[in-house]
Amino acid sequence: MGKYFGTDGVRGVANSELTPELAFKLGRAGGYVLTKEAAQPKVLIGRDTRISGEMLEASLVAGLLSIGAEVMRLGVISTPGVAFLTKQLSATAGIMISASHNPVEDNGIKFFGSDGFKLLDSQEEEIEALIDGEDTMPRPIGGDVGQLNDYFEGSQKYMQFLKQTVEGGFEGIHVAIDCANGAASSLATHVLADLDADISSMGSSPNGTNINACCGSTHPEELAKLVVEKQADVGLAFDGDADRLIAVDEKGEIVDGDKIMYIIASYLKEQGRLNNNTIVTTVMSNLGFYKALEEKQIETKQTAVGDRYVMEEMRKGNYNLGGEQSGHIIFLDYNTTGDGLLTGVQLLNIMKQTGKPLSELAAGMKTFPQCLINVRVTDKDAVKNNALVQQEIKRVEEAMAGEGRILVRPSGTEPLVRVMVEAKTDELCQQYANQIVDVVKEQLGA
């Protein structure tokens, strides 16, 4: 990770860490790096529903126009919507303003190249060097200054694409949705209604400050209540920028990213559409996920946490399905990044084609008890070299005797250390996790 870029673009508290001044510099430097080879550079900008989005958008636009790029504002749209449209409209670059599942005070800026993929490390390093160096980038004058246009109909083009990934509609399927008061709020309702699903919704009234507030993919228990109350067939919970999905079955049980990937990989294999009989996932996936796929004779490739690393492995090995337990699912046949709405549509299609309820589709995977505790710390990277923390991890691993797993890592986007433990029982899981958390707090706690 660089000075400004984390694992998922530039993030921080809006107007404090991620300031309009920094956004302007990112617009200039990012725009220059991504458009310097283009004769007529065109950059798309989308945002989620955060109150700070328009402030940062204005600064980004100014920076981009100042280097001579044409800017097309997409308005409120999902992150995968920006990625799709960047490639579809042959734009030089795309930019999304969002902090995904983070609280409203945070925001972020992520870039996409003309191919719709996230940037290479080398491109991010070049942008950072330009921000910190003397600004010698072009400053065109007169008619060469960039022009701003709105392209709000881009959302319609993206929704049309989503609908075309399945044949027929979802008549008779009752879907409960939680849009996290974010970018999916209008998109999900329109797409599912056009596909003839019956819809019950929550988290679909964004006001600029309620994004991810006790709703969405990080709080699927709220959707689970709605599914049971409305007797829905399935629940779909998105995050603020709709690049991830957590589902709920008809009984109100949560179906996380691992189970969603298991269901989709199994279906694609049956259809002969799983490239190289392999799915790509991260070290956070549950032991039960790997065991279930072994039984299906599906191979797995494991990467570091972060959908960018999943994507890199997918492109390297020509795999078409990958994702994370958190609900980032990548269908490389359709889009260039994780897409919650696309995942939801594909999941509904599998239910329709197989005639099976979600609970039955997910039943083939038995989840090992897993605890994930986030610890706020002063220096998240110090955890790797702290002798006492590493000592405690080793002690717990010995106690597990091969019947469990530990993963302690710094967050890629927040000042947190994430402690993940899997064990045979819930009690052991909690006990082992707390032992490690206590030492992390003592050594590094904020």
From Swiss-Prot:
Catalyzes the conversion of glucosamine-6-phosphate to glucosamine-1-phosphate. Mg(2+) binds at residues 100, 239, 241, 243. It holds the Pfam family PGM_PMM_I. CDD domains: GlmM. One of its GO terms (molecular function) is phosphoglucosamine mutase activity. It is an enzyme of class 5 (isomerase). Transmembrane segments: none annotated. It comes from the Bacteria. It catalyses: alpha-D-glucosamine 1-phosphate = D-glucosamine 6-phosphate. One of its GO terms (cellular component) is cytosol. Belongs to the phosphohexose mutase family. The active site is at residue 100. GO terms for biological process: carbohydrate metabolic process; peptidoglycan biosynthetic process; UDP-N-acetylglucosamine biosynthetic process. Keywords: Isomerase, Magnesium, Metal-binding, Phosphoprotein. The keyword Lipid biosynthesis does not apply. Activated by phosphorylation. This is Phosphoglucosamine mutase. NCBIfam families: glmM (TIGR01455), PRK10887.1 (NF008139). Its cofactor is Mg(2+). Binds 1 Mg(2+) ion per subunit. The keyword Iron-sulfur does not apply.
